[in-house]
């Protein structure tokens, strides 16, 4: 089949295929836990978390990468490899919520809060909270281990598995470093825009967009030119995705984002948005920002004051400009790429949806 004759890449059908794979895998794990008299809440908590929502962006980009690299034929192994990325994402989010002391994710209690609530009646609040913390670490670790299992049982040929493992290893290393950078920067927002962009690139851009595309393309046996074209599209898109997240963390509607709108301000996240505001603020505005950012007792009245400064300094408008710029860069990269036309069209739709969103 020529590139021009390829059918349109059906994102909805591929998303359903990934979710069917995840559901079957986790149902099997629940059965195994029951057979061995393991605590039922462990797998159930992870299953609830995985299916509480989410865009499935990483597995979908993995599948797009496979098509971009010229993949053809049976997709079962590719879908399961893509599903392994969603399981890895669950691991990353569970631990991220714990580090950020977040109460909700996707409108539901975070894993550590859910496990604490499960045990609170019998153990008391303090003991249940401690168990929730330790339990969330273990559930996250289990998701990491199971992402490996999904990959290694996908039925990939030895050469394809050998091609993709270094990419996955690189992705995992980048995520850990990005998360550590984010941890170190939290609570101490500075004027350092480059540092904020570095966190965005390693914590989100590479892991969310670039590496999933690389993994899919590697599964198709793609060469260096395809991988470089994936990077040219994915890095600006991933940065735009994170910049939109930063805006939603301050201005978003909790009923749409599924997260409290005050968390990023209480945590004084070292985002591009806050770095720009601190750069542009006058002495009085900077004093207010340093007074309020990072205050665990910050309330909506305080948040209104901060939002006013972000708008008055032009920081919010500048982040919107950066998003538009990176969105355009992603589209321009597709103009230069030799991807099948149907794949390029799908990647354009993904870029549009990832950067103009309310959740």
Feature-to-residue mapping (PLM):
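All-alpha prenyltransferase/terpene-synthase fold signal
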Residues: 1-359
């Amino acid at each position: 089949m020529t590139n021009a004759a390829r059918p349109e890449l059906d994102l909805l059908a591929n998303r359903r295929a990934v979710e069917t794979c995840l559901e079957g895998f986790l149902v099997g794990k629940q059965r195994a836990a029951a057979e061995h008299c393991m605590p039922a809440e462990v797998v159930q908590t992870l299953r609830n978390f995985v299916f509480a929502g989410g865009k499935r962006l990483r597995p979908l980009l993995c599948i797009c990468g496979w098509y971009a690299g010229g993949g053809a034929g049976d997709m079962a192994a590719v879908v399961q490899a893509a599903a392994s990325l969603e399981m890895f994402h669950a691991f990353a989010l569970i631990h991220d919520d714990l580090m950020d002391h977040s109460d909700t994710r996707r409108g539901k209690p975070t894993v550590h809060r859910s496990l604490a609530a499960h045990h609170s009646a019998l153990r008391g609040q303090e003991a249940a909270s401690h168990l929730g913390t330790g339990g969330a670490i273990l559930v996250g670790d289990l998701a990491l281990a199971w992402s490996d299992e999904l990959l290694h049982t996908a039925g990939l040929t030895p050469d394809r598995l050998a091609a993709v493992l270094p990419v996955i290893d690189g992705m995992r290393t980048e995520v850990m470093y990005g998360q550590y950078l984010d941890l170190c920067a939290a609570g101490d927002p500075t004027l350092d825009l480059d540092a904020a962009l570095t966190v965005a690139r390693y914590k989100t851009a590479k892991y969310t967009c670039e590496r999933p595309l690389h993994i899919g393309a590697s599964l198709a046996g793609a060469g260096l030119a395809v991988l470089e074209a994936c990077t040219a599209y994915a890095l600006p898109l991933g940065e735009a995705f994170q910049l939109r997240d930063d805006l939603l963390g301050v201005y978003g509607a909790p009923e749409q984002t599924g997260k409290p709108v005050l968390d990023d301000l209480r945590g004084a996240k070292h985002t591009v948005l806050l770095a720009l505001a601190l750069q542009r603020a006058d002495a009085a505005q900077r004093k207010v920002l340093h007074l309020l950012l990072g205050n665990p007792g910050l309330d909506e009245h305080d948040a209104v004051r901060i939002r006013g400064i972000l708008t008055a300094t032009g920081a919010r408008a500048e982040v919107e400009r950066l998003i538009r710029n990176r969105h355009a860069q992603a589209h321009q990269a597709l103009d230069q790429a030799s991807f099948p036309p149907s794949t390029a069209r799908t990647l354009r739709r993904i870029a549009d949806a990832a950067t103009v969103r309310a959740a």
